[in-house]
Amino acid sequence: MARAASTLAAGVAQRARGVTTYAGRLESLYQANLLSRQDLQRSYGGAYLSFFTFFERSIEDLFLGLVMGRLTCSTATRSLVEIRSEVVARRLVAGGRNYADWLPFEQHTVKRAPAFLSGGRPFTDVPGNDRHALQRAHYIRNALAHESNHSLKQFQRHVIGQQFVPPHERRPAAYLRGAHAVGQSRMEFLLAELVFVFDRMCK
């Protein structure tokens, strides 16, 4: 029997809470002079990358679950193919590659969805603001993972942009640790944003 896709969304929310709790413990160690600022910022970067990997895998799980009829959404979704084997499904979705990319969302997930799901729903129904949030998350991921001139320029242009960010917070990991609002780091805000986006995707 198919289960509600909202169970996947609950898993993403739980992972985000775990990352936020982890960051709070790191801050306590830093305040107690048991962790250097450099190590603290590196830990923020690692925590974000870990969550991003889990998030992208959750998009894959949602996609395959809907295609194979294992998951249901309240949004009208209908698989265009009948596949019982997950191995076969993964091969078809990957299109001959060893694995399938899901982000950038527009480039991979939205482009792939109409071949497997009627109208590409729910992925083609993701609104513009949510797609922007997913793209921004990917820019941050690339800047942290690659630290190349190109990825850092993309980060500066598309993530920092015109907003005021103190000079010492203009690198990716330091940016994540910086304050989005009183009592909330940028990483905490960004994870909450992705949780919201994925929850809407699953409805």
Where are these regions (language model features)?
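Helix-loop junctions and short alpha-helical segments
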Residues: 40-140, 153
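Charge-enriched, short contiguous segments at helix-coil
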Residues: 31-34, 38, 113-195, 202-203
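Charged alpha-helical initiation segments
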Residues: 1-53
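Short, helix-capping/interhelical loops that line the mouth of catalytic, cofactor-
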Residues: 1, 82-90, 162-174
